[in-house]
Amino acid sequence: LICSLEKFSGCENGKTIIIGAGKLGMALLEYSGFEEYGCTVSAAFDKKVTEPIKLDSGKVIYPMEDLSRFCRDNDIKIGIIAVPADAAQTVLNILCENGIKNIWTFAPVKLYKPADVLIRYENLALSLAHLKSQIIE
């Protein structure tokens, strides 16, 4: 069913990258459940990385300088933003400059985007607070 929906929607290519290789970015990079839904997390990028780092899983964390080439060579469609709020707008701008129009962000900040870019905001603290407000005792 998932394959049929992907083909119907034209979204067979779920090639994804992560920007930010801190704790959250690494957890997302190593999570294997995305592939079940047609998304392949290809790599991560981080400003603190100066040389590519290959993980035991085979995935690689690259320096930010490699982002443009990687996006061009790998037909990346989705970008995940896992950076602090003060860096998120810059990261979004870089992703947009590289043709990535589908964004999933964990940064707790409103981002300004071109009209043809889709952003899905994920606020983990807000989700937990919402659950807390509905505690059943």
Predicted features by range, described:
Residues 1-98, 106, 114-137:
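Hydrophobic, well-ordered beta-alpha structural blocks that scaffold small-molecule cofactor pockets
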